[in-house]
């Protein structure tokens, strides 16, 4: 019963709004001050239009006095005083005066007027928990038994004649404090009674967030969304992110008014889009792509491949690449040598120049800023796995000044955005963060921090973000400095999770001590490891569509890519410590090998753990499918790469493997890299003489499948072998 009582007011109010919101109340006028049309002002207008409020903006085009909005409220009083001159005698006209940059409407005119009249005063000011700007005035405030005690000048409502009296005595400067002016009037008992002023102590009309963040929560009900004040169990009509609470207003503004609900999802995501349909390649917006390689990064070759796969003509793209790492110098130069001419232009800042991270990012943004033909700046860090080729188009079509696609780390909640900031400006988890990351809430979100990948309009870089040093701010890291500077300019940063764009790489355990370091990334970055090293037709094999049986109980299917084969061979040759191919072998228990080969064991290159992960993830599922009823944990004592050469060890004598089953992966190509070779199963008199590169043979080991390695007659043959479940 208690729950029903709590929910009833919201349902009743929403029902009342839906009946009368089609036309705004004729005796209500909303006045606000906006010297320029910021994104905050456009949000305010959109929420007002949603409820059909009549809005009149005062002061557009005027300069705002004061610094950082700490002063300058006097301009608002002057403009209001002038605007009221033509309304001073309209006794029935109700005027709502409110800030706009950091305000959203949560309900419509009918509810607003009803609550105003219920206040039984001619003028109602918003109320705050904190006194400002003169704390010495606290003792003069009337004592309040229930509710907020102090006046807030960010919003008030009253009859036009009373508001005219309120501002009649204003003769201050534009840079003076409006808050102090209204406070002194309110604290004068005679004027307070004469004008008939009261405060909205219980936040029935106005919700100032400063000092009240813990009181306000989102309330979803009946396909609607409101802000509920838990302290007073009220549903405010206007939400004001005053003082340091603008980011919380951005969070609430993602939902209010009815912009996102559980029933409808995002109701405004398709508003104001910039369609690219039907536009020829030559007419598409010009984009500068900034690529940043700031630390050793795995799968850089995949990064460049994905960049090339973007569904956007290269001739409309310019490249700016900052490579801080000598380790990646050859890869970057190879990419540019092969594909640089495909782009409109290329600028490379390499490790030899020693440009710091923040300075390089400033360079990239400024290249677009200085070029009037640059419509967008697309910044992408090398640890971004951009798997959606349409990402750039999708971001452009969303038509935001600054927007980032959601990227997360595999299997983790780590992402490229923050939903909230702590008091000291660092990460804090918003209520909706997990739902956004995991896709339970889908939309376009106003957030305080983005990183790794984002799109900025060139027009924004030449206007609101024209400051050339975007990536320095106090002692913050470049990513945080960038976001702090954007927030300081009242530019919104948006994040979209409307599509699956890709993911972030984990760089925490990346090694650079090997020839091909990506081979060791199967734990940290399994998706990228699979893309680079597992054969594209492996999933078909797992579905039973590409599995052959050339000999009884010998299965043959694709497992490795060409790259996997080549890099494993090159890694072994780089290590170079091949065994001698005799029976004495100190690498194995007992020191004696019955059937010796010239090989290198996986544990010699510290690859044993990674190889076991490969067996568990990709071989074990095939084993269980091909040998029904057998389950394996893919344990092994021996896993190695064998080298066959005519003048070294051309073949292998008949033998049984010390395994329950064996895999034998061909690492190079017969007829190209070598001639001869293959495997013969003696009991079945069955031979496989043309192994396919990247395909593995899987067969039982001991007891049934007695086999030999056929002679390699020319070149060098490599195979990777594992004796599984010995």
Curated annotation (Swiss-Prot):
GO terms for cellular component: collagen-containing extracellular matrix; endoplasmic reticulum; extracellular space; Golgi apparatus; rough endoplasmic reticulum membrane. It is a peripheral membrane protein. InterPro entries: Collagen_mod_GT25 (IPR050757), IPNS-like_FE2OG_OXY (IPR044861), Nucleotide-diphossugar_trans (IPR029044), Oxoglu/Fe-dep_dioxygenase_dom (IPR005123), Pro_4_hyd_alph (IPR006620), Procol_lys_dOase (IPR001006). Keywords: Dioxygenase, Endoplasmic reticulum, Glycoprotein, Iron, Membrane, Metal-binding, Oxidoreductase, Signal, Vitamin C. SMART domains: P4Hc. Its EC number is 1.14.11.4. It holds the Pfam family 2OG-FeII_Oxy. Residues 1-18 form the signal peptide. It comes from Bos taurus (Bovine). Part of a complex composed of PLOD1, P3H3 and P3H4 that catalyzes hydroxylation of lysine residues in collagen alpha chains and is required for normal assembly and cross-linkling of collagen fibrils. Forms hydroxylysine residues in -Xaa-Lys-Gly- sequences in collagens. These hydroxylysines serve as sites of attachment for carbohydrate units and are essential for the stability of the intermolecular collagen cross-links. Fe cation binds at residues 655, 657, 707. Its cofactor is Fe(2+); L-ascorbate. It is found in: Rough endoplasmic reticulum membrane. This is Procollagen-lysine,2-oxoglutarate 5-dioxygenase 1. The gene is PLOD1. The keyword Translocase does not apply. Homodimer. Identified in a complex with P3H3 and P3H4.
